[in-house]
């Protein structure tokens, strides 16, 4: 971890010092001096000022206030706070305009164009501790962080509070999930919507829309390394000021460190329309470039797996008559994947440790020893023979010490068997020592797993994770993660499953942080195989139409994308052809229509290809859209393969009908999309042969 931090600081210094446009500006001694930096297009502007020795920043867009003056600083255990009696020593400015290529993603090319302001700050009186605040202002938002140089009076430290504020100028409408539930460090909850002024404590990304609808604001963080995750402490009717709320150690300390030290970036994404929020690259641009010597082994793919059967009760994780992770059953899934062009198979419940209360017995898991009815080596050999990747499952139940003891040996074993993908899990609220699931202790662990996996050539899909903060740029083997309420809640969720609006909110909230392993593709909407009968409306079940399940492959991005249903539920289903065809890696993404909580229409062009895919989803209301196909190449002829809600389709009463049709289209064509209540539409637009 220290080595990575040193590399990061070196990269930051080289970027700042190596630019020809860097200048040094002396700041006078006036207490109210304002220092400003704007985005390259001039629309976003940060203003920094001292008020009675305290440091504040504010944010404007098009001359209108987004954030009012908001405090910066820290409180420590065993040392005075670093918040008052400050002076600005100097400022440094620089500009960057460069582009880089993602090995995979929602877009292939990313432009990094920003103006940077670096303020060196010190206490006016002894011990005169020093720090810097670095602002980078982009056309799509702002990032800022603290940097602590090595110094005599600030060596080892323990942060009890980060005082960073976000003082909203408008009582904007927010879409949020809570962060203050006792012993509940998880993100698998339904979203609520309310004015900022009534928020308590919430998770990020926090997406907001100003009351006049002119600005969308998203607060999050980037490059979370060796620090605690940031949640937001709400105003509770007092005002509209949100404060950083760091996840704690068991003793209440938030962050332990030693100078030199840098914090994560605090990010504020800005857009005129909700549709402009996606694809979100602000956090990616605030992470260091890829450090892997080669990414040739990293391969986005679709996969099937022994997963949904355990949620609906047709299989079990633990050994017994319905054990899902048997050699024979794994081979059955591998055969299905090979026959249908599916890249991978996930097997859960293969390793010793699932007997009894596996959540409490977190140290019982072995990540190398299989149950007697599962031959890991033979399954790996068979998968390789069939051209299918075997995805290994590592559930920890939060026993991270047990996992770290075995990790090198386990990953070396997987590598020796030609296995290059792991799905990990952390089904727990606190660590075995009582630390927060999202605190510095766990952030260090998650980074150690990413780095160790990279060493052994392993891609990662992390469930129960800390939230994504753009680290996939630096370590592109960190493919996808859960971090929100996914499909499994449709099997057993207490509220009857995810409501039809859920995915239309995720697109504009959770997915702004990074890819999500939502696990779409359930065709047995009423879960007859798990129950023995169609489930009733009040019971847990999938609350979409079948066509919407197809559309989710385009709408909810993940480079590892599951076809989650049982293989037998896909047999003799013409609609399964869309899952066979749809890519998981994109060159271009365009959001055509969207309203948070209501609907999304998105078009994506496949990486290294000429086909486009359109996904449209709606909430409980039926909708129609007239979509121009001007994004297609002019002068080319295409065929649109359309998977629409069938006649009479309705998520509650008639979810299964799918109407499949084809029509010739060009860049001058328009498509009329008609979505049933809770429905969707999925379209493949390929060049005409």
Give, region by region, the residue ranges found by the protein language model:
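Bacterial N-terminal signal peptides that target proteins for export
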Residues: 2-16
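Bacterial N-terminal signal peptides
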Residues: 14-25
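N-terminal accessory beta-strand-rich subdomains and adjacent acidic, glycine-rich linkers
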Residues: 34-292
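Glycan-recognition and catalytic regions of carbohydrate-active enzymes
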Residues: 119, 565-613, 648-656
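An acidic-aromatic substrate-binding cleft motif
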Residues: 258-340, 344
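Aromatic- and carboxylate-enriched substrate-binding clefts and catalytic-loop regions
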Residues: 349-541, 545
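Carbohydrate-binding surface patches
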Residues: 596-638, 681-682
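C-terminal beta-strand-rich structural cap/linker in extracellular carbohydrate-active enzymes
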Residues: 662-689
């Amino acid at each position: 971890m220290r080595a990575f931090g040193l590399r990061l600081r070196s990269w930051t210094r080289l970027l700042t010092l190596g630019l020809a446009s860097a200048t040094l500006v002396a700041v006078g001694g006036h207490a109210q001096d304002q220092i400003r930096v704007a985005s390259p297009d001039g629309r976003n502007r940060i203003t920094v000022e001292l008020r009675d020795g305290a440091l504040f920043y504010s944010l404007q867009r098009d001359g209108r206030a987004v954030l009012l003056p908001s405090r910066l600083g820290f409180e420590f255990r065993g040392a005075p706070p670093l918040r008052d009696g400050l002076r600005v020593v100097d400022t440094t400015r620089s500009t960057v305009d460069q582009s880089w290529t993602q090995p995979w993603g929602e877009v292939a090319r990313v432009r990094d164009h920003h103006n940077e302001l670096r303020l060196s700050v010190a206490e006016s009186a002894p011990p005169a501790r020093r720090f810097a605040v670095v602002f980078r202002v982009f056309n799509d938002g702002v990032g800022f962080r603290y940097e602590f140089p090595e110094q005599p009076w600030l060596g080892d430290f323990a942060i009890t509070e980060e005082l960073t504020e976000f003082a909203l100028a408008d009582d904007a409408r927010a879409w949020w999930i809570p962060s203050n539930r006792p012993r509940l460090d998880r993100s698998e909850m339904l979203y609520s919507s309310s004015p900022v002024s009534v928020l308590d404590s919430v998770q990020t990304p926090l997406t907001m829309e100003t009351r006049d609808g002119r600005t969308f604001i998203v607060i999050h963080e980037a490059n979370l390394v060796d620090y605690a995750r940031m949640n937001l402490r709400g105003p509770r009717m007092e005002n509209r000021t949100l404060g950083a709320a760091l996840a704690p150690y068991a003793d209440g300390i938030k962050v332990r460190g030693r100078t030199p030290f840098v914090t994560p970036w605090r990010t504020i994404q800005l857009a005129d329309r909700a549709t402009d929020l996606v694809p979100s690259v602000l956090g990616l641009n605030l992470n260091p470039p890829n450090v892997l010597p080669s990414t040739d082994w990293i391969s986005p793919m679709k996969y099937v797996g022994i997963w949904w059967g355990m949620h609906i009760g047709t299989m079990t994780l633990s050994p017994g008559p319905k054990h899902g992770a048997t050699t024979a059953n794994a081979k059955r899934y591998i055969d299905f994947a090979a026959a249908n062009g599916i890249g991978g198979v996930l097997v859960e419940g293969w390793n010793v440790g699932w007997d009894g209360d596996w959540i409490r017995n977190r140290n019982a898991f072995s990540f190398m020893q299989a149950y007697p009815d599962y031959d890991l080596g033979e399954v790996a050999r068979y998968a390789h023979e069939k051209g299918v990747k075997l995805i290994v499952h590592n559930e920890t139940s939060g026993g991270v010490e047990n996992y770290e003891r075995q990790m090198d040996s386990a990953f070396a074993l997987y590598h020796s068997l030609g296995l290059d993908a792991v799905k990990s899990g952390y089904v727990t609220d606190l660590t075995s020592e009582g630390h927060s699931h999202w605190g510095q202790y766990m952030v260090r662990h998650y980074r150690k797993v990413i780095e160790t996996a990279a060493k052994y050539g392993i891609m990662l899909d992390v469930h129960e994770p800390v939230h994504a903060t753009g680290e996939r740029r630096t370590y592109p083997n960190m493919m996808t993660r859960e971090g929100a309420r996914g499909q499994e809640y449709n099997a057993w969720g207490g509220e009857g499953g995810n409501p039809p609006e859920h995915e239309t909110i995720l697109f504009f909230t959770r997915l702004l942080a990074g890819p999500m392993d939502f696990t779409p593709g359930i065709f047995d909407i009423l879960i007859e195989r798990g129950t023995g009968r169609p489930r009733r409306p009040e019971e847990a079940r999938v609350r979409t139409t079948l066509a919407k399940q197809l559309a989710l492959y385009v709408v909810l991005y993940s480079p590892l994308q599951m076809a989650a249903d049982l293989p037998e539920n896909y047999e003799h289903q013409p609609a399964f052809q869309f899952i066979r065809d749809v890519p998981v890696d994109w060159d271009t993404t365009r959001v055509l229509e969207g309203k948070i909580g209501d609907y999304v229409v998105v078009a994506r062009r496949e990486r290294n290809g000429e086909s486009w895919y359109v996904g449209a989803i709606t909430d409980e209301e039926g909708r129609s859209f007239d979509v121009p196909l001007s994004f297609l190449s002019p002068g080319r002829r295409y065929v649109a393969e359309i998977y629409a809600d069938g006649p009479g389709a309705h998520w509650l009463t008639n979810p299964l009908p799918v109407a499949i049709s084809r029509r010739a289209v060009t860049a001058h064509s328009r498509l009329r999309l008609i979505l049933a209540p809770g429905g969707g539409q999925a379209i493949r637009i390929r060049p005409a042969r």
